[in-house]
Amino acid sequence: MMNLLNKSLEENGSVLTAFYIFVAFVALYLLGRALQAFVQAADACCLFWYTWVVVPGAKGTTFVYKHTYGKKLNKPELETVIVNEFPKNGWKQ
């Protein structure tokens, strides 16, 4: 790093080298701001999808389950077949 700085001082002089260093810091600052804007946009995108897709999807799935599979059948003969004939957790007991 010092070798590069010494070479620039020899070839360009102190004023131009200082200007190059200043431009490099400005470029790093602008790069940081661009990355910050990108992260903020990605965060807003994730929040949008979570708010408008994930949460309503989970609520809709819960609603459908409660009003279809989660309901009691009120048919005891069918419930006994379901309980007795199908394996529990994938294993017959």
From Swiss-Prot:
Compartments where found: Host Golgi apparatus membrane
InterPro entries the record matches: E_protein_CoV, IBV_3C
Keyword Cytoplasm: no
PROSITE patterns documented for this protein: COV_E
Topology feature Intravirion, residues: 33-93
Source superkingdom: Viruses
Segment forming the signal sequence: none
Record keywords, A-Z: Apoptosis, Host Golgi apparatus, Host membrane, Membrane, Transmembrane, Transmembrane helix
Pfam families registered for this protein in UniProt: IBV_3C
Subunit structure: Homooligomer. Interacts with the M membrane protein in the budding compartment of the host cell, which is located between endoplasmic reticulum and the Golgi complex. The cytoplasmic tails of both proteins are important for this function. Interacts with Nucleoprotein.
Summary of the function given for this chain in its UniProt record: Plays a central role in virus morphogenesis and assembly. Acts as a viroporin and self-assembles in host membranes forming pentameric protein-lipid pores that allow ion transport. Also plays a role in the induction of apoptosis.
Designated name of the protein: Envelope small membrane protein
Protein source organism: Avian infectious bronchitis virus (strain Portugal/322/82) (IBV)
Protein's gene: E
